[in-house]
């Protein structure tokens, strides 16, 4: 494989480059350095995770392929761009960076220097390709001896999302050219503080790693990523940037776990498999994470009637209630937090069956996207090991199926706090499982709760496929989560908690119904969940129905992991 040495690109000879129900109503209860960047797939032979190791027969006899965990060595270096050697150099450029003088030459010093080394070829080629630095633009240029990728950052590059996109574009260019060694630089770092440079480097690393990941476990044939190393140029060196890139490594590992859990079909990832994955996380980080898995009988003892009613029909795949607890052995006071994830490993809709092309029943494997994010965050925090928090990770895992034992429309179920719910629609099941999960979380003595759920289609009508909706009566908590999301490059928008809508959720025979009659479905869903949270506990609900899945890429995104981890670390 050829190496790219910018200072000799034009002079070097041409060389070829190598081109991832029980209704428990009767149970009333009382109210230059570098380091390796390992990415271990869910099915990795080395990791022996349950999704790969599942022993029993599965529908269709499908079993994931084995794959080795790829490693990317990441280094933050002060090497000048024109002196760097490797296969592919990716440069992030804003529209201002692409400004030219009266002779059509670059005004930007770095691009000017690079163009000079290439005898004007960079300027000519970028003009020919109409590259102007607009967001979403990218052009891959091949020169004698190597490749340069120009990536547009828009009018300015001030957000983690911009740098994620730069890293992803670099990863895509590396994949298409089968590059092994790549570098990423910014055309200009003017106006970036030292802290901003560190955060930018971390975001670029995140983009490259997640952009390089391909979930090929269920393909009969697949190509492995050739990428071996990433150099981040011009953003500084030293222990602070090293720590930040290492942080990105741990978060990416959690995101990839989340993606793999959601991508895996329901005949592979069952409630039992989610429980085993939780056990694996606890085993890996046994000094800071403990695990408690409750089966149906134990949940019945706790009077979790809402959760068990949803699970009743899936007799072949019984429910498992997952509780992980992260706590370091330090004596300092710890803020008690809970992360609660909706864990429907498949949602048929029950007797209110999802029908028609618009129902997207074939994608209901992703109805455990909230649970996947919670488990991904647990994995990441097991590595990061924050000392001032105690975090409870809670998932009420089950399937929503149809059988003679199943929950019926019109049934009345009783949650573990004694509140009764008339089930007017079995396809509004996630909130029933979350009701008992939220009660359980409050019983752990936590101060704050975030729940994540693919709860409603209504949130996608309001915000589209890329933005999560945040619901909370607490302004302070809302600000915390919004700030964490912005720092992580994940999109969410605070939505109103319109209390007057609760009137439409009242039942004539029970305390409430589980689905509102019409518009404002995302709001009424959040108001329903609020009934099961203690008033003294700060609580925020994230409706992530849109961003957990990318229709464009036909893949899970791992949404929520980054925001959850960042929020925990800020407490």
UniProtKB/Swiss-Prot annotation:
Its main location: plastid. Binds 2 Mg(2+) ions per subunit. GO terms for biological process: cellular response to heat; flower development; protein hexamerization; proteolysis; response to abscisic acid; response to bacterium; response to insect; response to jasmonic acid. InterPro entries: Leucine_aapep/pepB, Macro_dom-like, Peptidase_M17_C, Peptidase_M17_leu_NH2_pept, Peptidase_M17_N. Mg(2+) 1 binds at residues 342, 347, 367, 429. Mg(2+) 2 binds at residues 347, 427, 429. It comes from the Eukaryota. Its EC number is 3.4.11.1, 3.4.11.5. One of its GO terms (molecular function) is identical protein binding. Residues 1-42 form a transit peptide. It is an enzyme of class 3 (hydrolase). Keywords: Aminopeptidase, Chaperone, Chloroplast, Hydrolase, Magnesium, Metal-binding, Plastid, Protease, Stress response, Transit peptide. The active site is at 354, 431. Induction: Induced by wounding. Accumulates upon infection by the pathogenic bacteria P.syringae pv. tomato. Triggered by insect infestation (e.g. larvae of M.sexta). Activated by the wound signal molecules abscisic acid (ABA) and jasmonic acid (JA). The keyword Chloroplast applies. The keyword DNA damage does not apply. It catalyses: Release of an N-terminal amino acid, Xaa-|-Yaa-, in which Xaa is preferably Leu, but may be other amino acids including Pro although not Arg or Lys, and Yaa may be Pro. Amino acid amides and methyl esters are also readily hydrolyzed, but rates on arylamides are exceedingly low; Release of N-terminal proline from a peptide. Belongs to the peptidase M17 family. PANTHER family: LEUCINE AMINOPEPTIDASE 1, CHLOROPLASTIC, LEUCINE AMINOPEPTIDASE-RELATED. Homohexamer (dimer of homotrimers). This is Leucine aminopeptidase A2, chloroplastic. It comes from Solanum lycopersicum. The gene is LAPA2.
């Amino acid at each position: 494989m050829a190496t790219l040495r910018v200072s000799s690109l034009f002079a070097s000879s041409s060389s070829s480059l190598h081109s991832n129900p029980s209704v428990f109503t009767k149970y009333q209860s009382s109210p230059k350095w570098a380091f390796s960047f390992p990415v271990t797939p869910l099915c990795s032979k080395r990791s022996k995770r349950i999704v790969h190791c599942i022993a029993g027969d599965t529908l269709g006899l499908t079993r994931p392929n084995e794959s080795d965990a790829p490693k990317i060595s990441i280094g933050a270096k002060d090497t000048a761009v024109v002196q760097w050697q490797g296969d592919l150099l990716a440069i992030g450029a804003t529209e201002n960076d692409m400004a030219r003088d009266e002779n059509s030459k670059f005004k930007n010093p770095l691009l000017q220097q690079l163009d000079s080394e290439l005898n004007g070829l960079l300027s000519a080629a970028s003009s020919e390709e109409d590259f102007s630095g607009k967001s979403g633009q990218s052009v891959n240029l091949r020169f004698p001896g190597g490749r340069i990728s120009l990536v547009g950052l828009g009018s300015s590059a001030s957000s983690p999302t911009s740098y994620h996109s730069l890293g992803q574009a670099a990863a895509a260019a590396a994949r298409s050219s089968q590059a092994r060694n790549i570098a990423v630089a910014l055309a200009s770092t003017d106006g970036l503080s030292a802290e901003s440079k560190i955060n930018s480097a971390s975001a670029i690393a995140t983009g490259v790693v997640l952009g390089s990941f391909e979930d090929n476990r269920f393909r009969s044939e697949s190509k492995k990523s050739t990428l071996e190393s990433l150099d981040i140029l011009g953003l500084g060196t030293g222990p602070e940037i090293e720590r930040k890139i290492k942080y990105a490594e741990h978060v990416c590992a959690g995101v990839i776990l989340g993606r793999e859990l959601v991508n895996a079909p329901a005949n592979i990832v069952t409630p039992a498999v989610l429980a085993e994955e939780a056990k694996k996380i606890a085993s890996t980080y046994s000094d800071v994470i403990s695990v408690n898995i409750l089966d149906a009988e134990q949940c019945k003892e706790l009077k979790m009637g809402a959760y068990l009613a949803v699970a009743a029909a899936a007799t072949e795949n019984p429910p498992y209630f997952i509780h992980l607890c992260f706590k370091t052995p330090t004596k300092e006071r710890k803020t008690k937090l809970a992360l609660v994830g909706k864990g429907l490993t498949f949602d048929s809709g029950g007797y209110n069956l999802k029908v028609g092309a618009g129902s997207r029943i074939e994608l209901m494997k992703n109805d455990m996207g909230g649970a996947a994010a919670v488990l991904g965050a647990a994995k990441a925090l097991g590595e990061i090991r924050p000392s001032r928090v105690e975090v409870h990770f809670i998932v009420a895992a089950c399937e929503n199926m149809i059988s003679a034992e199943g929950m019926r429309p019109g049934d009345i179920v009783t949650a573990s706090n004694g509140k009764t719910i008339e089930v007017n629609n079995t396809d509004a099941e996630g909130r029933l499982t979350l009701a008992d999960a939220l009660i359980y979380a409050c019983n752990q003595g936590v101060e704050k709760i975030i729940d994540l759920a693919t709860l409603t289609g209504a949130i996608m009508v309001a915000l589209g496929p890329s933005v999560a909706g945040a619901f909370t009566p607490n302004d302070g908590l809302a600000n915390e989560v919004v700030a964490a999301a912005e720092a992580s490059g994940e999109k969410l928008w605070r939505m109103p908690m319109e209390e007057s809508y609760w009137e439409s959720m009242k039942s004539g025979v029970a305390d409430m119904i589980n689905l509102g009659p019409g518009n404002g479905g995302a709001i009424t869903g959040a108001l329903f969940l609020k009934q099961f949270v203690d008033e003294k506990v700060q609580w925020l609900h994230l409706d992530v129905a849109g961003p957990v899945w990318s229709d464009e890429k036909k893949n899970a995104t791992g949404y929520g992991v980054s925001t959850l981890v960042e929020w925990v670390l800020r407490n």
